[in-house]
Amino acid sequence: PAGIHEITRSLSLNVSGVTIAGTGIDESILSFKNQVQGAEGLLVSANDFVIRDLAIEDTIGDALKINESENVRILRVRTEWTNGPLSTNGAYGIYPVQSSNVLIDEAVAIGASDAGIYVGQSSRIIVRNSRAEYNVAGIEIENSTFADVHDNLTTNNTGGILVFDLPNLPIQGGRNTRVYNNQIFANNTDNFAPDGNIVASVPAGTGLMIMANDNIEVFENNFGNNNSANIL
């Protein structure tokens, strides 16, 4: 239902075929401002999962983590740390990992101390029509295959879009990502990632950063006012 719903403990779901639906991205708000237990806001390990039309705010750790799941749809979901860009914010806003057939559509991610929208060690991914602001990394595709990132707005992050393949993770060999039709503007927020995080090395003012990933296509994006480099 609509309203601000105060939640003090992490939620989890491990039953497949579930839809969690609110009434709107700014109407149904799960607030974890007074969270006392757990790290994530919502942790999902389930197939055929849909979450839509709601917001998750001010979690201690990751807002929405989806682990080892297949057929995931994240539609019109907002994750936000409402006090602005702080190193004490949770690392990830929308965070599918080791998953497949993932759609993120019309999402909003604000204030993550690592990545607003992060898809890691996953395959067959679409991130589209979404907005990422005031994160260290706006959108990050890491150690993943067959990802399309298109028609998104990334602005006021440290780095707008990152495509990485990192060592020492269970799944290696990131490749076949397409980044197109995105608006990547003014990603000049000072890096506020905690010391030791990989993204702590991303320079403020980065539009798109690609590292150690193969078969990447970048086309028909609009870049502007990224003070270090539009493409790195």
Model region roles, listed by residue range:
Residues 72-77, 84-85, 101-107, 115-118, ...:
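Extended, compositionally simple hydrophobic/Ser/Thr-rich segments
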Residues 8, 33-43, 58-65, 86-96, ...:
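Extracellular beta-strand/beta-solenoid scaffold signature
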Residues 5-7, 17-60:
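Right-handed parallel beta-helix/beta-spiral solenoid domain characteristic of secreted/periplasmic
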